[in-house]
Amino acid sequence: MKVQAENAARLGRQVLGLLPPPTHRVSLTRGPEFARGVRDLLSKYAASTRPTVGSLHEALRQAPFRQPTYGDFLVYSQTFSPQEPLGTFLFSFKQEDNGSSMDMLLTPTSLFMLSGMEAAKAPQTHKVAGVWYGSGSGLADFIPNLSELMDTGEFHTLLTPVGPMVQSVHSTFVTKVTSAMKGVGLARDEPRAHVGLTLPCDMLVDLDESCPMVQRREPAGLNVTIYASLVYLRVNQRPSMALTFFQSGKGFAEVVAMIKDHFTDVIRTKYIQLRHELYINRLVFGAVCTLGTVPFDSHPVHQSLNVKGTSLPVLVFANFEAACGPWTVFL
C-alpha cells in the first residue's frame, strides 16, 4: 500500500508538471495598479534589495579585517644604521632561539653589504652600504658562518621577511625598530602619515615591463605584488648571494617563470663553475617570497637620499600593503 501511495503521489506531480503555469492578472489600463501588479509578480521570484537591519548587522559582522599589525624589535645599534629611511623593508635573521631579547634585522643595504656582490650589481646601493655598514659596524661578525650558509644555499631558511619600517628609536647601544608586519603602515611619530615601501632603484626589476609583448597583452589584476628574490652565486670563486626585488601583476607561477628567465645567464654560469664539485647541498640556486601588494593603477615616486657626498635613488610605493609570505625555492 505504501508503494502504491508513493507511485500515485509521483504520478500526480508529473501530471501537474504538464499543466501550464498559472496566469497573473496585471491591469494594463491603470498605472498604479499595473505597477503594484508587476511588483507583486516580481516579488515571487526575486528577493528584495532594500537593506534591512538584519542584512546591515550581517555585513558589519563579516567586515574584512584590515587592522594593521605591528612588531617591535630590539637590535644592537651598530648593526642598524640610523640613516635607514622610513619604509625600508626589514628582514629578521635568526639562527637559534637562545632566549635573548635582542634581534637582528637586515635591510636591502645591509644585505648587499653582506652578500659579497660586486659594485656593478647595484652601484648606488654599493656606495651607500659602504658608508652605513662599513668595517666599523661589525655586521658580518654576528653571522660567523655566513660563507657556509651562502655556499649551501641555506641563508634564506634563517631569513624571515618582516615588513616596512615605520619607526626607529636610536640610542648608543640599543635601537628599537617598529615594523608594519601586516596591512598599511602608519608612522608612529607626528604627523602620523602613511608609510609605504622604500626600495633602492637599482635593486628593483619590473617583470611586466621586461617580459615579451605577448605576455604583456594579457589581462592584469587589481593589484601588483612585490617580491623578494635571493639567489646564490659565486664571485671570484667565493660564495655570494644577490638580493633582488621584483614587481608584477601576473600569477605566482608565471612570475617564477619570468624570474628564471631573468637569471638565465647567471644560472648557466653558476652550474658551469660548479660542474666538477656539485653535490646535493649546492643544488639550490635561489628562493622567492611575496612582500605585499600595491594597487595596479598606482605608481612609485622617485626620491633621492643624500648620504655623505653620494645619493641613493629610491622608489617609494605609497599605497603598499604588507602581506609577507614564506620563501619558495624556484630552482
Swiss-Prot record:
GO cellular component terms attached to this protein's record: host cell nucleus; viral capsid
UniProt keywords, alphabetically: Capsid protein, Host nucleus, Virion
Pfam families: Herpes_VP19C (PF03327)
Alphabetized GO MF terms: DNA binding
Disulfide bridge partners, by residue number: none
Subcellular location: Virion; Host nucleus
GO BP of this protein: viral capsid assembly
InterPro entries: Herpes_1
Family membership: Belongs to the herpesviridae TRX1 protein family.
Function statement: Structural component of the T=16 icosahedral capsid. The capsid is composed of pentamers and hexamers of major capsid protein/MCP, which are linked together by heterotrimers called triplexes. These triplexes are formed by a single molecule of triplex protein 1/TRX1 and two copies of triplex protein 2/TRX2. Additionally, TRX1 is required for efficient transport of TRX2 to the nucleus, which is the site of capsid assembly.
Quaternary organization: Interacts with TRX2, MCP and capsid vertex component 2/CVC2.
Protein name per Swiss-Prot or TrEMBL: Triplex capsid protein 1
Organism: Human herpesvirus 8 type P (isolate GK18) (HHV-8)
Lineage: Viruses, Duplodnaviria, Heunggongvirae, Peploviricota, Herviviricetes
